[in-house]
Design a protein with these regions (language model features):
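Amphipathic, well-packed alpha-helical segments that form the structural scaffold of globular domains
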Residues: 107-115, 146-149, 177, 400
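Surface-exposed helix-capping loop/turn segments at secondary-structure junctions
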Residues: 53, 112-124, 153-156, 429-442
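Conserved active-site and cofactor/substrate-binding residues in soluble primary-metabolism enzymes
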Residues: 97, 101, 139, 223, ...
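Conserved C-terminal alpha-helix-loop-beta "cap" of PLP-dependent enzymes
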Residues: 43-44, 49-50, 158, 173, ...
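N-terminal entrance/gating region of PLP-dependent enzymes' catalytic architecture
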Residues: 1-128, 482-488, 492, 505
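Conserved PLP-enzyme active-site core in the AAT-like
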Residues: 126-128, 132, 136-368, 372
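Glycine- and acidic
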Residues: 86-95, 120-133, 156-160, 201-214, ...
Length: 516
């Protein structure tokens, strides 16, 4: 069989059971009052190691790179230190066992990729400020909401209003509640009942683009820019400051919101309603645009590099893939012809595209948007300008190690390969449909590195760590429920894993029992 030939998938083969590793028992790790002997302790750790190793080899359903072996070999020595990047990353602080110098190198790397300009200088409003997150992008999104809430709030003025699409990560709904940020749904329902400019009731989130059905369940997962512009216009006209979140690699469909296209629609709205100061200087804007790039902010810059110079990188993303514009370099001319930068903040997860063994991430904004840190700097010896107090000092080391191992050319190759594998999986699922006579509903948003399809048996979902989502093909009708799963083509996924998954699907009892 040649390297490019897919294995033959059996047609309507008798259903075969799938071996599933049972999760470890809690009793295996119970800690008695007297502790454990070395033998007992090591046996327990060996059991966990074996379980995680097996699961790592089959993980394809989540945005989590498992390509981590190199860092483990070189960085184990740092486990001897209690490393804590306490406080602001641009000041060493009183706790000296820290890796802030490495953290700043990582921030500088992403500042270059995201066109954020110069390293932090409090006297330079156009310099960037940021830090490495101890959580994933959820923390970065919360920090953006917190910063934006305080930046946009004016005494005696209408309260800021947040907008995010129905494909936004579920943590956003939690974050607005925790931080007391009002959504357009909440304000519209309470203050402007019956006035939704889209007609009908105020939607809970900004609608996403519809698909062939006319509904969003089979759409690409990107925000409906027309609907967003209409909603923002309504609240801007009422004097409300505006917070907008865009997604770059949405949670289930991997979609990229059209940040540039949306900004082209929103900038005139901001100007019409006085949310963009005419004079410049220190006067605050009345809007904040944030990009949740948990996944996509890690690879989108390399798509653009390849698109801009295909000869240098030996590849260019096709028109369907595109090269999203989403970062601090996105500028548009205002009504007087002056360029206006639109993006105020970006969040990215480090454990997703790059690959770190635990949740972490990067938050970045500009010095001109910062507000004073609220707590006592004298205790920690540095401004407490970050969301967390103690911050993981190992994450900068691991992310730095990854970035130092991979050139820009290497990073372009990683995203090229993921795009290629996404196309391969989508094609093979269509072929499997034809071979089995079963509708698998394979779908891929253009440019996404995820493919979604019919939910198989619970055993297969567990074996391959598949993430699931239920949709109603007719909104409000529970009889039209469909169950989907998806596969993310992360750098640790290869064709052999996909072929093994396809083989399992061809023998799965739930799939085979589906009427043809």
């Amino acid at each position: 069989m040649s390297p490019t030939t897919a294995p033959v998938v059996p047609v309507r083969t008798a259903a075969a059971p799938v071996h599933i590793d049972a999760e470890p028992e809690s009793g295996d790790f119970a800690i008695p009052a007297e502790g454990l002997t070395d033998g007992e302790r090591l046996r327990a750790l060996d059991r966990m190691d074996g379980y995680l190793t097996r699961k790592r080899r089959h993980l394809v359903g989540y945005q989590a790179t498992q390509e981590l072996a190199g860092s483990a070999l070189d960085l184990a020595r740092f486990m001897l230190s209690n490393i804590n990047n306490l406080g602001d990353p641009f000041q060493s602080g009183g706790y000296k066992p820290n890796t802030k110098i490495v953290e700043r190198a990582v921030l500088d790397y992403y500042a270059r990729l995201w066109h954020a300009g110069r390293s932090y200088d409090p006297a330079d409003p156009e310099s960037y400020w940021g830090y490495m997150l101890s959580m994933g992008s959820t923390e970065g999104n919360m920090y953006a909401l917190w910063n934006a809430r305080d930046y946009l709030t004016r005494p005696g003025a209408p309260r800021p209003v947040a907008f995010y699409s129905e494909d936004t990560h579920y943590s956003f709904a939690k974050a607005v509640r925790v931080l007391g940020v009002d959504t357009f749904h909440a304000v519209g329902t309470a203050d402007y009942p019956g006035e939704c400019p889209l007609g009908g009731d105020w939607p809970a989130e900004v609608p996403s683009l519809p698909g062939p059905s006319g509904h969003s369940w089979d759409g690409p997962g990107a925000v409906d820019v027309d609907a967003l512009a209409v909603l923002v216009e309504f609240f801007a006209a009422k004097g409300h400051p505006i917070f907008v979140n865009f997604n770059l690699g949405s949670t289930f469909k991997g979609a990229h919101d059209d940040v540039r296209g949306a900004c082209e629609r929103l900038l005139p709205v901001f100007e019409r309603h006085g949310l963009l100061p005419a004079g410049g200087g220190d006067e605050r804007r009345g809007f904040w645009i944030h990009v949740d790039g948990a996944l996509g902010a890690g690879y989108a810059p390399f798509l653009r590099m390849a698109a801009d110079d295909p000869a240098a990188y030996g590849w260019a993303p096709g028109p369907a893939t595109g090269a999203p514009e989403f970062d601090f370099g996105l500028t548009l001319p205002n009504r007087t012809g002056e360029d206006v930068d639109l993006v105020a903040s970006i969040a990215m997860s480090g454990h997703k595209w790059a690959g770190v063994p635990w949740p972490c991430g990067v938050f970045m904004t500009k010095a001109k948007y910062q507000l004073e840190p609220p707590t006592r700097p004298e205790y920690i010896g540095a401004p407490d300008s970050t969301f967390a107090g103690s911050r993981n000092g190992f994450s900068p080391l691991v992310l730095w190690d990854h970035l130092s191992r991979h050139s820009y050319r290497d990073q372009v190759e990683r995203i090229r390969r993921s795009q290629e594998l996404a196309g391969y999986l989508e094609r093979r699922l269509h072929e499997l449909e034809a071979e089995t006579g079963v509708e698998l509903w394979p779908a891929r948003t253009p440019g996404a590195i995820t493919v979604r399809f019919r939910k198989p048996s619970a055993d297969l979902v567990a074996k391959w760590s598949l993430s699931c989502e239920n949709v109603l093909t007719t909104p409000g009708d529970p009889t039209t429920l469909r169950g989907y799963v998806h596969v993310f083509l992360m750098p640790s996924v290869d064709r052999a894993k996909l072929d093994a998954l396809l083989s399992d699907l061809a023998r799965d009892p739930v799939i085979l029992a589906t009427p043809a």
